[in-house]
Amino acid sequence: MAVQTVPTYDSPCRMPNGLQWFEDELFVMDQQSDQVYVMNSEGYVTRVMDTPTENGSGITVGGGFLWTASNGITKFRDYRPTDTHIGWIYQLDLMTGAFVNRWRTPDGGGIHGLEWDDGKLWVTAFQPKAIHICDPFDNMKVIETFEVPTERLHGLARDGDGIWCAHTTDQIIVKYDVETGEEQDRIVFGEDSPAPHGLTIKDGELWYSDAVMTGVGVGHNDPDREGPEIGRITR
């Protein structure tokens, strides 16, 4: 189904690569600086947190913590002593972004999407292309996995009996059944529309962010747009 994207907030950062609504706050992961920007419901930044994340991508909130996807070697800032150049799932202080704990990704590689779900974490993977559900209270043990056929899994958003996953290169968002992994629904962006990176849901409405990765030397063939974007999806 084709959709309309509605730019809603000015992006607070150059590369808004992850989004998470939590209560009345929108958490934005900046892949360039690896800072997290927290915006209120009117779109104004209320605080900015430094994090140990490297090449930050997905973000979620749950269990009283902030969780970030550390996607390996950074390409957009100077190296820091905390950088390891490999993929991690970070557990951070919700108010300050300070380190609490971390775990390697299920496949040992990069990571784009995270979503909290009643004490568990949904996690995207690339080797193979899959979505895992993990237990952060049992050493990030993988509980279930379903493989998906589409490339470049990105933001995640839990919705009813399914989970939406942005597939950025294809400019689609697919809803997968959380029990079987079968496709339930599909949202198709137009050719000139944003490339969905971050994804979250608020009051039944999907929100997206486009980090505009074209021309930054990472090999992604995303639409060449004027700048980063945060908005809503209407159907």
Located regions from the model:
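Solenoidal tandem-repeat scaffolds enriched in leucines and small polar residues
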Residues: 123-124, 131-148, 154-156, 165
